[in-house]
């Protein structure tokens, strides 16, 4: 699986595990994703996938490197897709 595929899977998993917000974003904590069995089977390097998604402005979270235990309560936000301009 390449990085783009992993980021796509990450988006699906955040939608599955997270709470939808009024603005169309989804929020979930790092601990929920990290401790989910399905995510553990999909992502070889969850932190690397999160960093790639953050770099692409698909997700946002505080900090650079998330560590199990220390950052379990850090909120990860899957940003809503950009609005399509009306023609």
Curated annotation (Swiss-Prot):
Gene3D superfamilies named in the record: Costar domain
A Pfam family matched in the record: Costars
GO aspect biological process, one term: regulation of actin filament-based process
Sequence similarity: Belongs to the costars family.
Protein name (Swiss-Prot/TrEMBL): Costars family protein
Source organism (scientific name): Oryza sativa subsp. indica
């Amino acid at each position: 699986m390449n990085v783009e595929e992993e980021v796509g899977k990450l988006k699906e998993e955040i939608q599955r595990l997270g709470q939808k917000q009024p603005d169309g974003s989804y929020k979930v904590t790092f601990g929920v994703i990290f401790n989910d069995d399905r995510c553990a089977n999909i992502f070889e390097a969850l932190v690397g996938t999160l960093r790639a998604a953050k770099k692409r402005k698909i997700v946002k979270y505080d900090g650079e490197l998330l560590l199990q235990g220390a950052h379990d309560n850090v909120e990860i936000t899957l940003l809503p897709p950009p609005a399509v301009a009306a023609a």
